[in-house]
Amino acid sequence: MKHLNTVMAESPALITIFLLGYLLSTECAVFLDRENATKILTRPKRYNSGKLEEFVRGNLERECIEERCSFEEAREVFENTEKTTEFWKQYVDGDQCESNPCLNGGICKDDISSYECWCQVGFEGRNCELDATCNIKNGRCKQFCKNSPDNKVICSCTEGYQLAEDQKSCEPTVPFPCGRASISYSSKKITRAETVFSNMDYENSTEAVFIQDDITDGAILNNVTESSESLNDFTRVVGGENAKPGQIPWQVILNGEIEAFCGGAIINEKWIVTAAHCLKPGDKIEVVAGEYNIDKKEDTEQRRNVIRTIPHHQYNATINKYSHDIALLELDKPLILNSYVTPICVANREYTNIFLKFGSGYVSGWGKVFNKGRQASILQYLRVPLVDRATCLRSTTFTIYNNMFCAGYREGGKDSCEGDSGGPHVTEVEGTSFLTGIISWGEECAMKGKYGIYTKVSRYVNWIKEKTKLT
């Protein structure tokens, strides 16, 4: 024993070796190997364990699920801004497209606290709920609209205009385009033109507007031969307002050898449109354009002689004085267009019907300012609402054919009147005025329960353009 103690005291290295050997011999009883240990206990490894995150490639679970991440951290994972943005929109506040809010086949794109619908062709609106064809709001076109074969809106403009950069608006290409007064006044507008398209729904409207207006030459206006004295040629504006100089530059007055007798409207530099019943064979007619106050010379007037009159080929005064009541006058020399002499616009048949259905046109002239009263000196104008056909038919014992329409006020007091015949009924559309009617006839003037009767211009648009060479 003494010898052993001496050896251990003198040989500490031997003791160390002995202890290590003992421990190694007992390890298998305490620890399992790596493979068996993982079968008993699994624990997710923390990705930031042992290494700096700045030096580890981005991982979506580490960056944005275990912890709240920033956009930049998410960008490290996707390494693409577009993909990161798509993820971020849902990550921040959930998927706004989950309820599928887009209608009519629209594709929903999620955004932060909102969403965006990518609409199919022909639809628009926040949820693609609106028909974007010409049926609704005229396809947002300011004048004419048509649908292409693939249901896209194609806007166009009348003569003297072209499409603006937005492909919706129309801008003039000539100094004095049709239907525009170039002199502006601070007073109120004649009509509420700015609301025309926004308030109209054209779906199936053309069926309601288009009419069967073929009338045989033998058709007779009921009782017209017996009661013609009760019909007054429309030559006045009762209850209207004084126009401003240049406010209605397409208006003309027709002078006979003795006095003025009818009105008319400028179609172009060489042609005037008026009522056929104003014309009498052999009469000499002088047209005065740029007129304002017929009792004064204002140096804006242009006087032209009529060298040819063309009543509509179906007009026959001996059979019916007011059916097809429209005529064209050819001037001896062209008018000089300026701020006081400007033509009215003439649309195609379809759009002339549509514009008429807007329901708010206006008439103008120097006719009598009250029933059986004096003739106006200053050009008058009056807004006249369109009257539905059923009401119009009930208001009179005379036949109202489909080439006519009624406009005016049931309460009376406002109307076109004797002396206004042949003048224009105009509808203003987004700041441009279009011819929609011709003042024709009525029972007395501004009587309660009676309306003014107008020639429906849409029936004669093709004829007007053919004869006056408008394209």
Curated annotation (Swiss-Prot):
> Pfam families recorded for this chain?
EGF, FXa_inhibition, Gla, Trypsin
User: Where is Mg(2+) 1 annotated to bind?
Assistant: 61, 66
In this chain, Mg(2+) 2 is annotated as bound at 72, 76
**What coarse category fits the chief subcellular location reported for this protein?**
secreted
The gene is: F9
Locate the site labelled Cleavage.
192-193, 236-237
UniProt EC number: 3.4.21.22
The organism encoding this protein is Mus musculus
List residues of the EGF-like domain: 93-129, 130-171
Subunit comment for this entry?
Answer: Heterodimer of a light chain and a heavy chain; disulfide-linked. Interacts (inactive and activated) with F11 (activated) in calcium-dependent manner. Interacts with SERPINC1.
Indicate what this protein is called per its UniProt record.
Coagulation factor IX
